[in-house]
C-alpha cells in the first residue's frame, strides 16, 4: 500500500469502517468492479488524472460517494493539475457538508497542498470558513462535542488493545464501551438518533461507532439498527455504517452476516470471515452499500490489525 494512500485514511485504525478509505491493488481478484475503488486504485498508482475522471463522472451521475469520497475528488483533480476545476468542485460541494473542513485546510496531500498554494486560495478559504461557521451554527454543538470526545476515548482504548496484540487486551475496552452506550441511550431517548443535521457527519459517525462497539448489549444494537437504516435512507447516515451494524446484529442473533464485514481471530492467530450468507452474491451486496470488494477488505484488515486474514 503506498504511503500516499495510507495518508488518505482519516478514520481511526480500530474502526472496521476504515476499509472504506483504504484500498490495495487487488482489482484482478475482485468479483465486482466498483468505480470509486477503481479511482482509489488510480490514486494509489499516482494516476491522478484517471482518478479525477472517474470520480468526476460519478459526481455528474449523482452517485453517492463513500465517506471522504468528495475530498478525494478535489484531491485527485488538484493533483492532476486542474486547480480551477478542483475549486469549482469545492464550491459545488460545500453546501452538502460532505467536505471535511479540517482536511480541506490542513491535510498534507499533494493535490490539496497545490490547491492551498494557488493564488485564488485565500478567497476560497474565506468561503470555506464562512460555510463551516454557518454549518456549525445549525448543529447541537454540546452534543456533537460530547460524541466526539467519547468516540476518541473509545478509539484510544482500541489502539491500546491492538498494540498489545488484541485478544484479552480488548477486555480493557469494555468499561469505555459500556459507559458510552449507557450515555447514548439517554441521548436517543431524549433527542432521537444523532443525524448529520443534528450533530454533523463527524458527530453522527461517533454515535454509530459507540453503537457498533456495544457488543456487550446486542439488544441495544438491534434496537438502534432501524434508526440507522432510516437515517441512511434519508441521507442522514452512511450506507456502509448501516451495513456494518447490520452484520453485527445478525451475528449476535445467531444468523449469518449479510455484508461480510465481521471477522474473528482463529486459533492460529489469523483472522477469518465469520459465517456469511450467499457468498456468490457478496461483492454485489457490498458494492450496493458502498463497501469495497471482499479481497480488498481482507487486505485492509490485515494491514490494520497486523495479522494474516483469510
Identify the residue ranges that each predicted region occupies:
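Structural register within alpha-helical repeat arrays
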Residues: 38, 72-73
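Boundary/linker segments of alpha-helical solenoid repeat arrays
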Residues: 63-69, 96-107, 136-138, 236-244
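Preference for long, solvent-exposed alpha-helical segments and helix-linker "stalks"
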Residues: 94-97, 107-198
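Bacterial N-terminal signal peptides
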Residues: 12-25
Amino acid at each position: 500500500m503506498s504511503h500516499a494512500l495510507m495518508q488518505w485514511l482519516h478514520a481511526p485504525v480500530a474502526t472496521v469502517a476504515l476499509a472504506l478509505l483504504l484500498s490495495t491493488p487487488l482489482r484482478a481478484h475482485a468479483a465486482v468492479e466498483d468505480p470509486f475503488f477503481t479511482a482509489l486504485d488510480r490514486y494509489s498508482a499516482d494516476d491522478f488524472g484517471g482518478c479525477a475522471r472517474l470520480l468526476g463522472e460519478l459526481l455528474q451521475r449523482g452517485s453517492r460517494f463513500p465517506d471522504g469520497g468528495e475530498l478525494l475528488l478535489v484531491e485527485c483533480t488538484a493533483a492532476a493539475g486542474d486547480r480551477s476545476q478542483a475549486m469549482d468542485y469545492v464550491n459545488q460541494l460545500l453546501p452538502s457538508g460532505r467536505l471535511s473542513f479540517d482536511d480541506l485546510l490542513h491535510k498534507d496531500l499533494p493535490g490539496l497542498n497545490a490547491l492551498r498554494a494557488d493564488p485564488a486560495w485565500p478567497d476560497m478559504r474565506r468561503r470555506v470558513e464562512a460555510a463551516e461557521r454557518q454549518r456549525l451554527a445549525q448543529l447541537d454543538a454540546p452534543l456533537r462535542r460530547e460524541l466526539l470526545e467519547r468516540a476518541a476515548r473509545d478509539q484510544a482504548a482500541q489502539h491500546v488493545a491492538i498494540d498489545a496484540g488484541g485478544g484479552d487486551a480488548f477486555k480493557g475496552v469494555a468499561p469505555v464501551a459500556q459507559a458510552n452506550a449507557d450515555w447514548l441511550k439517554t441521548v436517543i431517548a431524549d433527542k432521537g438518533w444523532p443525524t448529520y443535521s443534528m450533530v454533523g457527519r463527524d458527530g453522527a459517525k461517533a454515535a454509530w461507532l459507540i453503537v457498533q462497539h456495544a457488543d456487550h448489549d446486542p439488544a441495544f444494537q438491534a434496537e438502534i439498527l432501524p434508526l440507522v437504516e432510516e437515517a441512511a435512507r434519508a441521507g442522514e447516515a452512511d450506507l456502509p455504517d448501516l451495513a456494518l451494524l447490520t452484520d453485527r446484529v445478525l451475528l449476535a442473533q445467531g444468523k449469518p452476516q449479510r455484508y461480510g464485514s465481521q471477522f474473528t481471530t482463529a486459533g492460529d492467530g489469523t483472522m477469518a470471515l465469520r459465517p456469511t450468507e450467499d457468498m456468490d452474491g457478496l461483492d454485489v451486496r457490498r458494492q450496493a452499500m458502498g463497501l469495497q470488494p471482499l479481497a480488498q477488505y481482507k487486505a485492509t484488515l490485515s494491514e490494520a490489525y497486523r495479522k494474516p486474514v483469510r
